[in-house]
Amino acid sequence: MNDAPTPNSFRAGPDEDGRFGIYGGRFVAETLMPLILDLQAEWDKAKSDPEFQAELKYLGTHYTGRPSPLYFAERLTAELGGAKIYFKREELNHTGSHKINNCLGQILLAKRMGKTRIIAETGAGQHGVASATVAARFGLPCVVYMGATDVARQAPNVFRMKLLGAEVKPVTAGHGTLKDAMNEALRDWVTNVDDTYYLIGTAAGPHPYPEMVRDFQAVIGEEAKAQMLEAEGRLPDMIIAAVGGGSNAIGIFHPFLDDKNVRIVGVEAGGKGLSGEEHCASITAGSPGVLHGNRTYLLQDGDGQIKEGHSISAGLDYPGIGPEHSWLNDIGRVEYVPIMDHEALDAFQMLTRLEGIIPALEPSHALAEVIKRAPKMGKDEIILMNLSGRGDKDVHTVSKFLGMDV
């Protein structure tokens, strides 16, 4: 996976307790701690096992379709009139997003641990689809927890999961979004620790999940680095990616963290604006607390109760963020900014019409930030954006906001 980080590297974390500075850790029920420690031990062995790495690489090539292309967005670049814009085309992967990278790695771990049942949480449905896909590939039953709100707005992905043989359990608690789905998945896991593997989709949760998910997703940045050197003979000036829990972003950011001349920007969901509570900008407008087994930036009230938040994008509709992102924000290595729903919708339409690529609403947030920054940069500068998912799943949501019937 990653080349070994050097001393004083931004890539050296987490420590042995799973912490990135004050963030991360393992805040779990006593019944789960033995399982978490078993997972840690199995992960430590798998990282250095050539057979595990070879099987993962084989599946990446022949099942996922890696490497994903690096694409120069010529018409978008000309339209914006500034920096050259490149996309890392993760939406071309099998299942339509970056999520499959992590799911393949974790299902191989589940097999090593002798687990016979897979559970997962999902927001946009992309992780649910990827989890159901790998479960089908390896012949394991799969239960996907999905907030009832997301079930309604992501109907195509719900049907795909069912086609793949997964049981989709709508969660009506709270606002029926990703946070609530994750709560239910954790309850299931506590009840079924012996036979069940919890396949977490984002770079959050108790250690070792944030590290594991990052390392399985780092293939994005590793490939992009080599591809950029081949295409331009140098690294990009800026990398931009959308951040919900943060798996696609940490996947492209991590291999570049020690390249000091590469500016890195994470884009949070600004929803309907930061003045109220209808957003999911955990770093921009949140504060540190504990949720889903790790300490990180959260949207919470004065009593530490988690706020619900909002985003037009189901995949960014989460009131927290991966702990490594929290740390990268605090040390100033990565800049985190919000993009509003309407800006993401405008970016969605612009890319579709200029490049013939229909992006998911998640990377549309990153694209909106690209649209802001590229014109202010020189024509000799380069922006690399992670195009983390395709927009088929979002067509109904977008059509509703545009006042069109589909």
Curated annotation (Swiss-Prot):
What biological function has been recorded for the protein in this entry?
A: The beta subunit is responsible for the synthesis of L-tryptophan from indole and L-serine.
Q: Which reaction is catalysed here? A: (1S,2R)-1-C-(indol-3-yl)glycerol 3-phosphate + L-serine = D-glyceraldehyde 3-phosphate + L-tryptophan + H2O
- Modified residues annotated as N6-(pyridoxal phosphate)lysine in this record: K99
Tell me the organism: Agrobacterium fabrum (strain C58 / ATCC 33970) (Agrobacterium tumefaciens (strain C58))
Q: Which UniProt keywords apply?
A: Amino-acid biosynthesis, Aromatic amino acid biosynthesis, Lyase, Pyridoxal phosphate, Tryptophan biosynthesis
On the tree of life, the source organism's domain of life is Bacteria
Assembly and binders: Tetramer of two alpha and two beta chains.
The cofactors required by this protein are: pyridoxal 5'-phosphate
The gene coding this protein = trpB
* EC number(s) per entry: 4.2.1.20
Chain coiled-coil ranges: none
| Cell division is among the record's keywords | no
Give the pathway. Answer: Amino-acid biosynthesis; L-tryptophan biosynthesis; L-tryptophan from chorismate: step 5/5
Recorded protein name is Tryptophan synthase beta chain
An annotated GO cellular component of this protein is: cytoplasm
